[in-house]
Every structure is written in C-alpha cells, then in structure tokens.
A protein has these predicted regions:
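Membrane-interfacial amphipathic/re-entrant helices at transmembrane-helix boundaries
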Residues: 1-22
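Hydrophobic alpha-helical transmembrane segments
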Residues: 14-19, 64-72, 94-98, 149-154, ...
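Hydrophobic alpha-helical segments embedded in the membrane of multi-pass proteins
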Residues: 22, 45-46, 101-102, 189-200, ...
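Short loop segments and helix-boundary regions at transmembrane helix junctions
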Residues: 29-120, 225-237, 252-264
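Transmembrane helix-bundle core of multi-pass membrane transporters
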Residues: 104-162
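Helix-loop-helix "hairpin" substructures at the membrane interface of multi-pass membrane proteins
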Residues: 144-216
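Membrane-interface capping segments at transmembrane-helix boundaries
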Residues: 168-169, 279-290
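Short amphipathic alpha-helical interface segments
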Residues: 291-331
Length: 337
C-alpha cells in the first residue's frame, strides 16, 4: 500500500526542488521560443572549471567562492557560444557543443591536477544532492530552512522580476528579432542579459539538483507549455506549474520507489510531456485523430445519404436493395478504421 504521508524532511526536499524547477521553467520559455533550449546544457556542463578554480583560489569547499567561480564560467560559456554563433559563422548547436565539451573536459583535467586528493566529485555537479538539502540548515526569520533554498529562491525571484520587467522587450525579441533591432531596442544587451540569467539560475540550482535536472527543467516544462498554449503569458504559467508538478511527483515517486529525486523529477516531467503531446486539446495526437475520424465519418455519412436519395429518385422504392448498398458501404468504412 502506498503511503503518501510526507515527513518534514520530505517537504523541505520538495520545496527546494519545486523552487528550482520553477526558476528554470521561467527562463525555459524564453529559450524554447528562441530554439535555444540546449543552452542550459552547455552552461550546466561548462561550469566545472569554474568550480575547480573557485576551490583552488579559496582553498576550501565553501559555497560562495565555488559559486562565484561557476558563475563566471557559466557567463563565459554563454558569451563565447553567442560570439561563435554571431561572428564566426558557426551554427548555434555546433558552437554550444564545442564550448561545453571543451570546458567540461578542462574541468575534469583540473580536478585531476589540483583536487585529486579532495572530495570534489564531478558527479555531484551532474546529479546534485537535493536529498541531503535538509542536512545543512540556515535561519530565516526564526525558521530553519535548507541552505540550498537560499540561492534557488533567489534565482526564482530574480527570474520572476526580470520576466515582469522585460516582458514586452523579450517577447518582441523572441517572435520578431528583426523588428526588435529596427525598433532600436538594445537587442544584444537584452539577449546577453537573458544568457546571464540562465547562467545564474544554472549555478544556483547546481548544489540542489545538479546539471542534469537543470537541463530537464529548462527544456521540458517550457515544451509542455508550448504544446498546450498559444500565448506567451499562458505558456509561462503552464511551464512554471509543470515544473512544480514535476517536482512534487518526482519527490513523492522517489520516496515510494526509494530512488533519486532528480532522476524521478526528470522522468515525471517527461511523462507530463508525453501526456501533453497525446491529450493537448489543440495539438494533441488523440484529439487530432478523433477530429479526423469524426470528419471522415461525417463526409461518408453525407455521401451515403446522397446516394440513397439518388437511388430513391431513379428507381421504385425497394427497401431491401436501396438500403443494402449504402449499409454495406457504411460497414466497410467502419471496417477500415
């Protein structure tokens, strides 16, 4: 029997995961509309050298210096990939692939050189440690909360504020970049600012959920919103809610199945995407097939009625023969479906 009663520790894990998913989902909409969702992948893998350099410079594994190093590396990844795309004539996907693979390999080499005897595991960057978030606590207004909630919630509030503040500008840049340039908007500044926010969000979520889940939470909830919605405002709301629902389902599922929360969150978001693709009222496969079948049956029924009418006008009424041909045709139509 499934026990859905969650402990306070489980609620804290869910809270951290939900804030991380919502923060990623807000920016994921902007990246999906620009067809650059894999930028989060590049940043998530490319920050490893920054983490190592932050450790080497500070001499400790304190959160702040390593986050600063990772943030600098993430901004460098986004700017370098954008520069290659704009000025070197390199395809956007190829530029991201070159940048993040090179920097991730560099990070592995730096770990082997400078941190071989230190418990600095690249796997923690990939998979996070959201299950251990309640271990490290800080005080908020007299309440004890997970330490990793501070950067994650900060990233969520920052992304929410930026989305509200630059709503019209980002919307124009996403749907009509040529008009945005012609309107004398600071197009490059707005796009670079978006990349910086992606970098900040990725770094803020690393300790909690790892780079793999950052990639999933940037791309999948926004894609769900894109499938279900025709307006950008609705897409942002649906994307954020899809991320939060994925966090809830992932946490509960991981507890019940005794597996990792980040992986279960990614699986949950993938399941929601499959459900959206199948059942979306406007674009879903099942509603589309139902509409096609309904229209086909309507056309065929009208043809049967027309044929019956013509037969009744051209020959004396013979109920057996006149109804036989249309009826047999109708059953043949059903047999094809």
């Amino acid at each position: 029997m499934i026990d859905l009663q969650l402990t306070p520790v489980s609620w804290q894990i869910m809270m951290v995961a939900a804030c991380a998913a919502a923060a990623c989902g807000l920016l994921g909409v902007q990246l999906v509309l620009r067809r650059r969702a894999m930028l989060g992948d590049a940043i998530a893998h490319g920050v490893l050298p920054g983490l190592v350099i932050g450790f080497v410079v500070s001499g400790s594994r304190d959160l702040f210096p390593m986050l600063v190093g990772a943030l600098i590396a993430a901004i460098f990844v986004s700017i370098l990939a954008e520069w290659l795309r704009e000025h070197a004539g390199v395809d956007g996907g190829a530029a991201l692939g070159v940048v993040f693979t090179s920097l991730f390999a560099l990070g592995i080499i730096l770990i082997e050189i400078f941190a071989r005897d230190v418990d600095l595991d690249a796997g923690c960057v990939l998979y996070g440690m959201v299950e251990y978030a309640p271990i490290h606590q800080v005080e908020w207004f007299g309440y004890s909360v997970p330490r990793s909630l501070t950067p994650v919630l900060g990233a969520l509030l920052l992304n929410l504020g930026a989305t509200v503040l630059f709503w019209k500008e980002w919307k124009l840049c996403a749907f009509d970049p040529q008009l945005a340039r012609a309107s004398r908007l600071p197009f490059q500044t707005l796009e670079q600012g978006l990349l910086v926010l992606v970098a900040i969000t990725s770094v803020a979520c690393f300790e909690a959920v790892g780079s793999v889940l950052v990639i999933a939470m940037i791309a999948v909830p926004a894609t769900i919103g894109h499938v279900l919605c025709d307006r950008m405002s609705s897409m942002v709301i649906v994307s954020t809610l899809a991320g939060v629902v994925s966090a809830v389902l992932g946490t509960v599922g991981a507890i019940q199945l005794e597996t990792g929360v980040p992986g279960m969150m990614a699986v949950s978001s993938g399941g929601l995407l499959v459900g959206a693709v199948l059942l979306a009222p406007g674009r879903g496969l099942i509603p589309a097939a139902t509409r096609n079948f309904s229209w086909t049956m309507r056309v065929e029924m009208e043809d049967i009625l027309a044929e019956s009418h013509l037969q009744s006008m051209d020959s004396p009424p013979d109920h057996t023969d006149s109804a036989g041909a249309p009826s047999s045709r109708f059953f043949r139509i059903l047999a094809t479906w």
